[in-house]
């Protein structure tokens, strides 16, 4: 923990407290002990010490909450996490709204809290929407009071009471004879109870708000009178008509009145939270909360489209998806088409029912499964679109045509005129359809639409997005068990309208439509069904899972908080200390979002050494909360009070703010929630803000986590939350915090010390100096002095409109100039995307805005809102070998990677999965073993080059490079039981039979009796057999079942029962026989082309319970289960299943031996040159994937191999260098060809007397640098290691095993250390045979690995996809996606050329977060009621176009160079554009020149005049200089220039906004540079910037830096 002192931040005494004591909870004065106490224990300790102060109210609440928890436990229940949060709010008497899904316990919470408060003598009122709910709630409460002997009077009124009962209940209500009252909202409308309530719980706000006066009634129930309600409504009206200042004045008066009223607590609960009208805002004015209607944007729907539009397609998808669908017919086809579709489906045996406003029958039958599909018209207020909420039943939706609006074109034009939105008169009478289309596009600014003519009138058709969202949302609902998955299939009837729908879905909901053939429907249906099963099973158990957790997310700005909250619907809002706190439900998190308002603390001014306490060689910053009065910042309380006093004496308005209030808000919410997310910006400043928040929230909540996102989009927020759930949360980086601390202290020390000197000299106490601003001021002065120097300048106008100018001393009297012209084709690459400095430079020039304005605009815009080909094999942590595409899609997390410290292969974690559309050249690298790797040019591989291991990009790999290859390493592989293999392969339609003595079956039988309601349970119990799929579903341990199961078989007539067999070496050897030369047809497995009797004998031994027979040249065995296992393992077709390589080594080796015995070969080949035989060991296949996977595995157990191809057949050849290892590990499992191997082995060994070497290492150049003591080489000779021969041999290779021995005798050196690391490591090397560039258009994939940042790809070590953020031009994969989607939406896919602009350790560039151009942004802003200025639009347009251009192909131009000999100058530009490329989006910054075809040009005009030697700087040019010279940071560029302007050191010229130093600025600079050059020089400033960076990287001790800075400051005299 970093030592810091926070003034006035002790939660108890409001005194100063250290960061260490904040971790304990209170300061030393309050409690001497240093133990961390539980909250109630802390209260007890403070009471004992008699120091309990500010925490007293919290202690009361904590104690009451404990009481409530115990009360609920005594009733026999446990509070859910979310209920605990609600309880704490009620106990604080804070009113609020609950917007959560049905079933998470909100109604029951209302009951529990009412009983608890009633027990304490308080009066409670539960308001429900229906009589049924009133009855059920009354029965529940009555049952609880009776069972637990609670003396609580409960009264319930409802319409089903008898006349006598109604009279009695009304009398009791009239006489206040109750503690808890329960009625419908309808009762409240007609009968207003007279007494005041302490707690009112409204369950279902929609029913309450049917009568808007009920809002007033609820407020009166709480103790507010008519007068105060009317005053509150007056404020609402003033705000509505724009009289904000008047409203604020009245609000201040109202707040004082409310503070004197002891009112009750109101909870408004709803699953939808729809609220209408102005009166509902009374809750905001009087109770500090607003009702939200969250979850309408919460959807997990796969949006699919099919361009085949027909009834037949509806039938096809219903048959595929099954029961539980809705068919929505586009409104323009009407009910008649819906009836036609109903009839068609019924005729095809689909149980379908049409639902519409006049016929709503069918809902219950659909719920019960008697109807499979409902049909309705896609209308926003249709009964199916809005009235259906069956998450357990509705699985998918089919849209027959795109939901659309039909608008009469004439009426639409007239309505625009009436609203004043159409300035010119538009007449469509007598126009052709083509002309009308042009009017709609150009005048009405509608891009995607359809035009129809009905009854001589044109209809405009545009997509009805809200209806689509609402209707498709029926398939994905938030429930107590989480958000369900749904599918939506749109049958496209109008392509133009569909394009508009796609855009809207992308912009508004960040959802991308997928073409039907891009979706794995089998997986989708499986996930949909899993979610429904979860609801079914969960509700059957009758217990609400504790899924919904409450989390406080703290961001920096209120804008950002609001934007994030609005991603998920209209949030509920609470006002705490006059600040908005937003609340939304996002799946299983109840997210509460608030803002810190940026930095909360700053250094004090009047304590320590300029705000730093120095003691015991420590430098401890003393912080206090930032205070502002009318925008002016203070840290000293006395200064603040003095200013307020002065303003009040002058009668001026005082707008005061203390950032401490933000911490108090955070602390209050922290006490309520389960956890806190620190979501400040991920940079140095954001890290310090986050650290301050975290440390000050600690006394109230210890579950604090860091989350981060580099763009404000729904996708990014959900991704950050998902990362946290997976355990990938970030932590606050203390090094960054230390960097910020030092930067601020240094700025304070130098600023205060030098500023005081300036005050003394110039007698102006507003002057300031700083280490960065002073050099920058110097540049502006230096430029100004140069500008004053005048030089002669000649400007010529030549024929053909050629202009040229040059500094020219002499007269120029020529009438003609000689020219040389070159014209050639030239590719012009786009500029990279903007960084902070380039944006400031460009935007200041273009728009004349200040850097400060542009930074502010960019911030507000922000707040709104390397890879491999898919066939690359990656080795997983359990040994499985799968394609990277499958790994990314399945998000497999455990992979093998290389620990670079000791070169050992270890299990690591994939933390990010990348899938990117790529169109460009790939590097195809072919290795000497003929394995191949295809990668994007920047994908890095581990290469031995220049005697070092280096990461080299694929584009820079050369022939004869050596790439690191994992070799002979250990993997923890595990056996798999038969039943678990069946589960893995999804072969679950098999029956398991148990004998009479089975104890496990008794457990199964008990489960069946208790949980299975259908008659099939008797069949299971009677026959003692159960389908495997149910045993899996019921979560029984399959390994335990396998121990006692008697038989297994398929429920097909004639299928033989077989005993459960072991998947041991014998089974996997058999599998190898089939892999080599077998075939599978139905249940029969045939093995051919081998000694048949031998095979038959092997099968007899492996499967003694099955008959096998010889037929022709084949041995046949039949069993449907074994046949399906082999089929799904890929033994004959498809992919060889990667699970094989997760089995124990002996099993895989037996499989490979079986393969050799059917389709392998052992033969001796005579080498005439060496006069010796080589042993050829080879496997063959037409399937490359089989041999590649086996080869990768063989390398892992130390067997070298190469891959060859001849015609269509592949061969895997085992290297003779690995003969001994092959004999030891594979050959012992051979049966049929064992003798052939042994004979070959004996011959080879006899002729090759030297000991076999497993592998050779290409390290001779490093080896040659070793030194040996005298006599040691002789010792090695005795061991038959002649290293002198190694020096002579031409090869670079050295035998690994011999090198190990040699290294024991070598002298110690870095070279020895390097070689020892390699020989003892888990790698060898493979030579690069060939490198090619190949075109590619498709997806590429990558992984981000947590620790080692590499993985095994196609048998070599491959670097992962790293992703860091800083100010740079780097484009992330998300950025590339935005560009790709924009170009695709605008039919510019051919222009795409993704570029990463890679920068090591870099942040991302400035870019848009949505594929939305400026016109679309304006439309988006209108629809979402977001107001931005024209300058915002300009800056966005600039950023957008520059970014999209950076991801497009080069422009190709006919380039012209005109060399003017007489002036020795060139004019350059383009004559013609051959291919526009990126210039289609962004300006081509080249002159357009005429084609010149002669050798001289006439001078038409000439001028010789005096001009300034250099132009003055503008703000953008100064920013560029700061970047180039390493002064300042992106976040401070604009601030530095603003400070120079504010201090009066610099002014801007009126005409061109150029920077001009003032007399004061020049004098201040001269004084500083003459007296303190060592402190404010450019070099010293740059040096300090580098030191700060080192602190942030953990390379330098920040205390030592502060010590040095302190000494430097003390030198100022």
From Swiss-Prot:
Cofactor annotation remark: Binds 1 zinc ion per subunit.
Pfam families in UniProt: DEAD, Intein_splicing, LAGLIDADG_3, Topoisom_bac, Toprim, zf_Rg
Residue positions binding Mg(2+): 556, 681
The keyword Hydrolase is annotated on this UniProt entry: no
Binding residue positions for Zn(2+): 10, 13, 27, 30
E.C. number: 5.6.2.-
Motif annotated as DEAD box, chain positions: 203-206
Residues noted as binding ATP in the record, renumbered to the chain: 83, 100-107
Post-translational modification: This protein undergoes a protein self splicing that involves a post-translational excision of the intervening region (intein) followed by peptide ligation.
Xref: SUPFAM superfamilies: Hedgehog/intein (Hint) domain, Homing endonucleases, P-loop containing nucleoside triphosphate hydrolases, Prokaryotic type I DNA topoisomerase
GO molecular function: ATP binding; ATP hydrolysis activity; DNA binding; DNA topoisomerase type II (double strand cut, ATP-hydrolyzing) activity; endonuclease activity; reverse gyrase activity; zinc ion binding
UniProt subcellular location: Cytoplasm
Catalytic activities: ATP + H2O = ADP + phosphate + H(+)
InterPro entries associated with the record: DEAD/DEAH_box_helicase_dom, Helicase_ATP-bd, Helicase_C-like, Hint_dom_C, Hint_dom_N, Hint_dom_sf, Homing_endonucl, INTEIN
A GO biological process held by the record: DNA topological change
Annotated disulfide bonds: none
All residue ranges annotated as the Helicase C-terminal domain in the record: 310-525
ZnF start-end (RG N-terminal-type): 1-38
Xref: Gene3D superfamilies: 3.40.50.140, Hedgehog/Intein (Hint) domain, Homing endonucleases, P-loop containing nucleotide triphosphate hydrolases, Topoisomerase I, domain 2, Topoisomerase I, domain 4
CDD domains the UniProt entry points to: DDXDc_reverse_gyrase, Hint, SF2_C_reverse_gyrase, TOP1Ac, TOPRIM_TopoIA_RevGyr
NCBIfam families, sorted: intein_Cterm, intein_Nterm, rgy
Function text: Modifies the topological state of DNA by introducing positive supercoils in an ATP-dependent process, increasing the linking number in steps of +1. Binds to single-stranded DNA, transiently cleaves and then rejoins the ends, introducing a positive supercoil in the process. The scissile phosphodiester is attacked by the catalytic tyrosine of the enzyme, resulting in the formation of a DNA-(5'-phosphotyrosyl)-enzyme intermediate. Probably involved in rewinding DNA strands in regions of the chromosome that have opened up to allow replication, transcription, DNA repair and/or for DNA protection.
Family: In the N-terminal section; belongs to the DEAD box helicase family. DDVD subfamily.
Misc: This enzyme is the only unique feature of hyperthermophilic bacteria/archaea known and seems to be essential for adaptation to life at high temperatures. It may play a role in stabilization of DNA at high temperatures.
Comment field on protein domains: Introduction of positive supercoils requires the cooperation of both domains. The helicase-like domain probably does not directly unwind DNA, but more likely acts by driving ATP-dependent conformational changes within the whole enzyme. A beta hairpin in the 'latch' region of the N-terminal domain plays a regulatory role in the enzyme, repressing topoisomerase activity in the absence of ATP and preventing the enzyme from acting as an ATP-independent relaxing enzyme; it also helps to coordinate nucleotide hydrolysis by the ATPase domain with the supercoiling activity of the topoisomerase domain.
Protein name in the entry: Reverse gyrase
